[in-house]
Amino acid sequence: MRDSPGCKVTIIGAGIVGLATALTLQSEGHDVTLIDPRPPGSATSFGNAGAIVSGGVVPTATPDLWQRVPKMLFDPMSPLKIRWSYLPKLTPWLLRFLDSGRRAKALKISRELSTLTEHCLEAHHRLADLAGARHILKPVGWLKVYRDDDAYAGTAYDRGLMDQAGVNYQHINAEELHQLEPGIARDYTVGLFQPDASFVSTPYALSQALFSAFTKRGGIHHQEEVRRFEFGDNGEPRAVVTTHAIHPADLLVVAAGAWSKDLARQLGSKVSLDTERGYHLSFARTEAGPVLNRPTVFGGPQFVLSPMADGIRLNAGVELAGLDAEPDFTRIKALVPLAQQCLPGLSGEITREWMGYRPSTPDSKPVIGRSPVHGNVLYAFGHGHMGLGLSAITAKLIADLVAGRDSRIPLAPFAVDRF
């Protein structure tokens, strides 16, 4: 199906996925409007670790999850937390999540994710060129470090998935590790380095570059909350009703991240979507502070330290608590002494506490494609931990759908009605 050339497209959501899609569609001649109650790039897109990794093929749920979850839930330093008051509402999603970790399913999911991630860097380069922002992407790679060979051996399953997907990675010894990152504690002796990865030291700056390019070319932005849709005589949505106005639309793209579930429901699609709430702390830069050259995952405590433009950022944790619960920074603050051990010289001065809502499906795959209910509705949400990384390739796939082009990436695995 091909939509009319130069049609009026309304995109709900001005995070990194919505912004990428807006600029991509606009570059192909479409009249694009963005609607979001929050400023562009200020929600989940704001606080990630800044990594764009070609080779993110390991789903969140893996075959050993059943054995690990009980210990994780009762370990105060664990990366996983569930708010027990939210469990009744979470249970259907959680059961699907655990089921997706079965060996055969996890292997299939990994293969399907690889069809997206293998193209993500190329797509980001094209998108950044549209915005004149290629300089924001730094080709420094993605590093995971471990204290010993036994800890590294524990990644065998992940590496097996990477091998079957043809992911480019290197096993590095202590000398190679500390050549890459001399500031990391010396008791880290082995690593896994993925060279095909870029780093964005200020994710918000990338969002703003895309938004600036979009508005300079005539794109329209309404900072308004979507309440409902108006439907035409043919049953298709023809306008978006917000808190301030009614905005006509020929074509709708739902790219509202964690807030997409209710919008999809109003448009006739029931989707299994919840939030993996993620936290970060930013630490002040000091003249004597540690040197870190790229985002680095520290095995064991399972957190990421990234050298952001405004200081070192600690990203950690998955909290399953929905959209309404207040943030709880207890766990991530408890990790600060560990982070200082991993990166000696790290300042203890916290300059920002942040929590964001990762829009997550139980099978770790985004929702990308045309609605089975309405031909003029497209979906682009549910990217979980990979919103930044998959934003540009998602935008290209949406543009291919609008243009009626063969993307060469099968979209059935990402359909909204797969659950």
Predicted regions and their residues:
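Rossmann-like flavin
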Residues: T91-S212
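A conserved short coil-to-beta-strand element within the FAD-binding core of flavoproteins
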Residues: I172-E176, L180, H222-R238
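Glycine-rich FAD pyrophosphate-binding loop
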Residues: S27-F46
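N-terminal Rossmann-like FAD-binding beta1-loop-alpha1 element of flavoenzymes
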Residues: C7-T33
